Regions:
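Conserved acetyl-CoA-binding loop-helix of GNAT-fold acetyltransferases
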Residues: 106-113, 117-130, 150-154
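Helix-loop element at the rim of GNAT/NAT acetyltransferase active sites that forms part
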Residues: 22-38
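Conserved active-site alpha-helix within GNAT-family acetyltransferase domains
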Residues: 122-123, 136, 143-171, 179-181
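Active-site rim helix/loop that mediates acceptor-substrate recognition in acyltransferases
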Residues: 35-64, 68, 72-75, 95
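Conserved acyl-donor/pantetheine-binding loop and adjacent beta-alpha core of acyl/acetyltransferases
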Residues: 71-108, 167-171
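Conserved GNAT acetyl-CoA-binding A-motif
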Residues: 104, 130-143
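Conserved N-terminal entry element of GNAT/NAT acetyltransferase domains
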Residues: 1-19, 23, 27
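Glycine-rich phosphate/pyrophosphate-binding loop shared by adenosine-nucleotide-utilizing enzymes
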Residues: 2, 66-70, 104, 184
């Protein structure tokens, strides 16, 4: 495997490279054959919205001059929409952090199969979170994604519960190669960030 280099993209660069990001998305998330175009278009629509969110940040990895992985996120809206549908009470300190704009949502972590289990995902998350002033990071993951859940546990994340967003809600989820559909049950995980 070639050496992997990680770099940060500005909002403008992310918008300019959206087609390349979508290519990685399609390759990383092996969906139903024949649905690639629809999945790609849905991703591009959501990505265009996410790039405009407050606190958007993104890192990309490449190996041998080719894309290997992408990760991005943003500060969660203060309205608490992220937590709706959670099957447990949101801890008061998490609510306080959300209202004060101190929660970073890891929206996507896409690692191509050839680069999985090599530490790339760990490095991507670490680099992405370096510049945020948030006190907490959270994400949603498909509970059947054993590799993703295992990575979260090894990184010291805590599961808050399962959530089913309203059918109309578009809530990003991380899959490390296994996508989650809109309205699907996801597990909500979080981790405190040290200053």
């Amino acid at each position: 495997m070639p050496e992997v280099f990680i770099r940060r993209l500005s909002r403008w660069q992310a918008e300019q490279q959206r087609e390349d990001v979508a290519d990685v998305y399609v390759e990383a998330y092996h969906r139903v054959h024949g649905e690639e175009f629809h999945d790609r278009q849905e991703f591009l629509r959501a990505f265009a919205e996410d790039v405009q969110r407050t606190g958007f940040d993104m890192v990309v990895a490449s190996g041998g001059g080719k894309p290997a992985a992408h990760a991005y996120g943003f500060l969660l809206d203060r309205d608490g929409e992220w937590w709706r549908g959670l099957d447990a009470d949101v801890p008061w300190d998490v609510e306080e952090l959300t209202v004060s704009g101190q929660v970073f949502g890891l929206a996507e972590l896409m690692v191509l199969p050839a680069y999985r289990r090599s530490g790339v995902a760990t490095r991507m998350v670490e680099q992405l979170l370096l510049r945020t002033d948030a006190a907490l990071v959270t994400l949603r993951v498909d509970p059947a994604n054993e590799a993703g859940v295992g990575a979260l546990r090894s990184w010291g994340w805590t599961r808050l519960g399962a959530a089913t967003p309203p059918a109309a809600a578009v809530v990003p989820s991380v899959g490390v190669g296994v996508g989650v559909g809109v309205g699907a049950v996801t597990d909500v995980w979080c981790r405190a960030l040290t200053p």
